Amino acid sequence: MRTRLSAATKPVDETQARVRRKEQTRQNLMQAALTLVGNGSSFTALGIREITREAGVVPTAFYRHFKTTDELGLALVEDGGITLRRLLREARQASLPGEDMIRHSVSVFVTYLKQHHLEWRFISSERSGGSQSLRNAIRNEIAHFTNEMASDLRLLNIFPGLST
């Protein structure tokens, strides 16, 4: 017996597939920029054609995801910051004694750096160079990270008197 998809189900499946493809293209563009930076290119010198060629998409596809290369860079900073802060927050909430929690957090951080070395190469080079908007975004991510860590350490009373 053959099951027929209702007319309402088919467009939903197609829409979901389109959303997945769009997200995959966005990720490919971001990874392409990181790969090019990892190969020695300066992010600020990267062109849209160069990024899209590396990503395997046509140049017009870039504009469906980002208005400028700066916007792409901001997405890289944001994604990296959100992921790292989440991982470190989970590490700090692992109910470990103070010093063990710090060691675990450092271990998580080092593992993340090793697994995401291209992101960190990008962030470290753009932190002092590149565009003002990227420098500001990186500075904000560092401030978020520092504030979250200081707040958790204060709550654990590991460093009494630590201001947050």
Model-derived segments and spans:
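Short, hydrophobic secondary-structure boundary micro-motifs
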Residues: A45-L46, R121-S125, G161-L162
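Amphipathic alpha-helical segments used for helix-helix packing
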Residues: K114-Q132, A150
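Hydrophobic alpha-helical connector segments
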Residues: R89-Q115
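Amphipathic alpha-helical packing segments from all-alpha helical-bundle domains
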Residues: I82, Q132-F159
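Helix-turn-helix
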Residues: N28, L36-E71, A75
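N-terminal intrinsically disordered/low-complexity leader segments
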Residues: M1-Q24, N157-S163
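Generic hydrophobic, amphipathic alpha-helix propensity
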Residues: R21-A33, I51, L76-L84
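Alpha-helical DNA-contacting segments of helix-turn-helix folds
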Residues: F66, D70-T83, I123, A137, ...
